[in-house]
A protein has these predicted regions:
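Short alpha-helical DNA-recognition segment
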Residues: 11-36
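Short, conserved catalytic or interaction motifs in soluble domains
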Residues: 39
Length: 64
């Protein structure tokens, strides 16, 4: 994790131009849960990571 506590999940979401609120809504999770995934304080379940790959339009996450 880098110095400002972002993860590749946050970086990919931001690169896709999607707000945290919108991403959480589209993923069917709370903003708090998404924030926990993005900060690295909660592991991202494999199926949720697959949903993020689809939503953010990046295959980079699929390789992680």
């Amino acid at each position: 994790m880098n110095s400002n506590n972002t993860t590749i999940f946050q970086t990919c979401r931001q690169a896709a131009g999607i707000t945290q609120e919108r991403a959480a809504e589209l993923l069917g999770i709370s903003v708090r849960t998404l924030a926990a995934y993005e900060s690295g304080s909660r592991p991202v379940p494999p199926l949720r990571a697959a949903d993020m790959v689809d939503l953010y339009g990046t295959q980079f996450l699929a390789m992680q």
